[in-house]
Each structure stands twice: as C-alpha cells, then as structure tokens.
C-alpha cells in the first residue's frame, strides 16, 4: 500500500534535516513505536504496538537507514517486523524529502507499507484509514518535537502517545471512511 503525506514545519530546512537524521527521535514520534536497541550504524531493533478495541497487534523487528542524501535532504528508512504472536508481518519503506520554503520546510513522505497475516484480514480500506490517522498523529508529534527543540526544550518530554490505541483512532478512521 502506497501512502503519500505532506506537512509544513515552521523551521528552517537544516533544523528539520537534523531532526530526521536522528532515527530514535523520529521513531519516538510514531504512536506505539519503541526502539529498544541500536544494533549497528543506523540500525535499530524495536517494537510497535497498535490496538483498536479487541484487536491488539504487537510487532517486533528492525529499522535502518537505507539511504541518506545530505545535499538533496532525502532520507529513506526501512523497517520490517513480525507479530509477536506469529499472526503476521509488516514492512515499511519511508522516504522523507525536505523542501525549503524560505524560513519553513515542507516535508513530503512517501510510505510503502506491506502487511500480511491477521492485520491484513481487516481489508485494505480500513488498514489505509488507520494508517492515515497514525501518519497524521506522527506528523503532529514531529512538528511538536521540532518546535520544542527550537525553543530549547526537551523534545522527548512532548509528542506522541505511548501506544497507538483504540477509540480515537477508530473514530478518526471511521470518519475518513464515510467521507
């Protein structure tokens, strides 16, 4: 499933680039994500937990920087994991491209998400709607954390919820589905 998402940050491109070059900080913006260990240069192990009502998916896997272009301000992250209960797997390639808008920056995300097993049974439309809500929450967290950095505050003290869960995601996804 291919998903494109763009947002604007009221920070200069070099500050936004420094943020995206910090994988643990970027991962902390994803609801339910937790990097547990750095296993090598630009390679990490971690977990992602997503729950909605009675459905709870817990993935364990790896995330790495696949490529980085400091001149063009493009970074590609690649992740893959398996459900801890053996009910499926997921992989993602996130391509983040930054474009200067004077004193602010446009962030263009291209996300290629593949889900198999139990999570895939809910149908492409529902998974796409849930994913869109999670991406919106991630983008909001990124903007909040970048603002905290610019203001000299601890970016880890603000931002994403600990887990991606339940009612708010389900309601937002339902709202998207009926539009």
What are these regions (language model features)?
Residues 140-179:
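Short, highly charged C-terminal tails/helix-capping segments
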Residues 118-155:
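A conserved amphipathic terminal alpha-helix motif
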Residues 2-8, 43-45, 58-60, 74, ...:
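Intrinsic-disorder/low-complexity, polar/charged segments enriched in Ser/Thr/Lys/Arg/Asp/Glu/Gln
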Residues 38-80:
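Glycine-rich portal/gate segments that line the openings of hydrophobic small-molecule binding cavities
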Residues 1-43, 47, 51-53, 165-179:
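Hydrophobic ligand-binding cavity/cleft-lining segments
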Residues 16-20, 26, 65, 109, ...:
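Hydrophobic pocket/interface hotspot
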Residues 67, 81-129:
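Beta-strand/loop substructures that line and gate deep hydrophobic ligand-binding cavities in soluble
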Residues 6-8, 49, 64, 97-99, ...:
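Generic structural detector for well-ordered beta-strands
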């Amino acid at each position: 499933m291919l998903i494109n998402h763009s947002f604007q940050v009221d920070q200069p491109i070099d500050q936004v680039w420094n943020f995206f070059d910090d994988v643990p900080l970027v991962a902390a913006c994803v609801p339910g994500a937790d990097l547990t260990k750095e296993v090598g240069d630009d390679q990490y192990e971690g977990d992602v937990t997503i729950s909605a009502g009675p459905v709870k998916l817990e993935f364990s896997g790896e995330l790495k920087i696949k490529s980085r272009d400091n001149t063009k301000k493009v970074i590609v992250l690649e992740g893959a994991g398996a459900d801890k209960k053996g009910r499926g797997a997921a992989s993602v390639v996130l391509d983040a491209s930054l474009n200067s808008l004077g004193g602010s920056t446009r962030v263009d995300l291209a996300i290629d998400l593949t889900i198999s097993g139990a999570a895939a049974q809910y149908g492409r439309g529902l998974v796409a709607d849930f994913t869109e809500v999670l991406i919106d929450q991630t983008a909001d967290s990124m903007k909040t954390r970048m603002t905290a950095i610019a203001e000299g505050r601890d970016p880890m003290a603000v931002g994403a919820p600990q887990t991606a869960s339940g009612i708010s995601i389900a309601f937002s996804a339902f709202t998207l589905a009926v539009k």
